[in-house]
């Protein structure tokens, strides 16, 4: 055992994406978290501190290291070795933004270790480059709600910090990999279908920006881009939608690629919906979440706390 000083911690919220028809462009932060505690060390080492991340690679084949190295390489710098304790309650491969949170944390890790002073736009671009789209990553980076578009040379984003809604999630204990969820989607749409699907998405975005939650819910349920094709992968979706509607929920949708199912309901009514869904779906985890205002948060240890490490 050796001693090393704690340098800083990085906390990143999880996220949901799509909200129905906002496919690959609408993301919202959720109050599940990934936390990195970073210590000075003589070699790279990652240690899991929660069951969710118990299988993470301990060395430089870790996604967090690989992403941080890409940032360092871009700036022509070399990452100093650190020991990283990793804690998370964002379940993997469940549609709650676990990979996006890790990518955002990794970018901030490089930013802090190398004192890069990256701008928000740079962070969002890097995260979107790795993820392929800005929805989950942008929500985790900034908190609140994000609507975005990633292009080859720029990422565009519109942000809404304060989202006054309760979010109840039903999390099945099986995984749905993003690749499998994308494989069930059609290669293309007819012109007529594309126009209809885009119109639904446009109204969703307008309703989100004005926080017209009944209209948001209506559009969530009218998605034509992906949910009609993914219901076969998540049989609980229609059942959750039915139970939630009886309790007055605004709308229900897959969270990202699933299998997590997300329901929006008036602030203060989420606990009642959570209890009802827990009774109806005992084989799933059911949780009441909020939409955090803050995205990634860095805290430097003011007392240079000393920890025992390997």
Curated annotation (Swiss-Prot):
Alphabetized InterPro entries for the sequence: GHMP_kinase_C_dom, GHMP_kinase_C_sf, GHMP_kinase_N_dom, GHMP_knse_ATP-bd_CS, Homoserine_kinase, Ribosomal_Su5_D2-typ_SF, Ribsml_uS5_D2-typ_fold_subgr
Catalytic function, reaction form: L-homoserine + ATP = O-phospho-L-homoserine + ADP + H(+)
Main location: cytoplasm
Keyword Cytoplasm appears in the UniProt entry: yes
Function: Catalyzes the ATP-dependent phosphorylation of L-homoserine to L-homoserine phosphate.
Alphabetic keyword roster: Amino-acid biosynthesis, ATP-binding, Cytoplasm, Kinase, Nucleotide-binding, Threonine biosynthesis, Transferase
GO CC terms of this entry: cytoplasm
One Pfam family matching this protein: GHMP_kinases_N
Residues annotated for ATP binding in this entry: 91-101
Species assigned in the record: Bacillus pumilus (strain SAFR-032)
Pathway assignment: Amino-acid biosynthesis; L-threonine biosynthesis; L-threonine from L-aspartate: step 4/5
Enzyme Commission code(s) on record: 2.7.1.39
Assigned protein family: Belongs to the GHMP kinase family. Homoserine kinase subfamily.
Keyword Kinase: yes
Gene Ontology biological-process entries: threonine biosynthetic process
GO molecular function: ATP binding; homoserine kinase activity
Name of the protein described by the UniProt record: Homoserine kinase
Lineage: Bacteria, Bacillati, Bacillota, Bacilli, Bacillales
Cellular location(s): Cytoplasm
Cysteine disulfide links: none
PROSITE patterns: GHMP_KINASES_ATP
């Amino acid at each position: 055992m050796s001693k090393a000083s704690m340098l800083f911690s990085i906390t990143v919220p999880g996220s949901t994406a799509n909200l129905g028809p906002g496919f690959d462009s609408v993301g919202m932060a959720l109050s599940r978290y990934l936390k990195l505690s970073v210590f000075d060390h003589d070699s790279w080492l990652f240690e899991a501190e929660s069951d969710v991340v118990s299988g993470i690679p301990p060395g430089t084949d870790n996604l967090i290291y690989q992403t941080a190295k890409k940032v360092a390489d871009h700036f022509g710098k070399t990452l100093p070795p650190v020991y990283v304790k990793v804690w998370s309650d964002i379940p993997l491969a469940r549609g709650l933004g676990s990979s996006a949170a890790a990518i955002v944390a990794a970018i901030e890790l490089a930013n802090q270790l190398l004192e890069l002073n990256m701008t928000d736009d740079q962070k969002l671009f890097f995260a979107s480059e790795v993820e392929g789209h800005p929805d989950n990553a942008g929500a985790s980076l900034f908190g609140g709600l994000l609507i975005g578009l990633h292009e080859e040379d720029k990422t565009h984003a519109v942000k809404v910090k304060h989202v006054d809604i309760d979010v109840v999630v039903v999390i099945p204990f099986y995984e749905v990999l993003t690749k499998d969820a994308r494989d069930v989607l059609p290669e293309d749409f007819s012109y007529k279908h594309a126009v209809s699907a885009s119109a639904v998405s446009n109204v969703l975005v307008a309703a989100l920006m004005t926080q017209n939650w009944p209209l948001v819910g209506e559009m969530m349920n009218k998605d034509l881009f992906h949910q009609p094709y993914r219901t076969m992968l998540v049989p609980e979706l229609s059942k959750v939608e039915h139970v939630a509607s009886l309790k007055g929920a605004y709308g229900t949708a897959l969270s990202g690629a699933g299998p997590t199912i997300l329901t929006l309901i008036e602030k203060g009514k989420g606990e009642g919906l959570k209890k009802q869904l827990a009774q109806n779906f005992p084989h799933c985890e059911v949780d009441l979440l909020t939409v955090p205002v803050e995205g990634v948060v860095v805290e430097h240890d003011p007392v240079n706390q000393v920890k025992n490490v390997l």
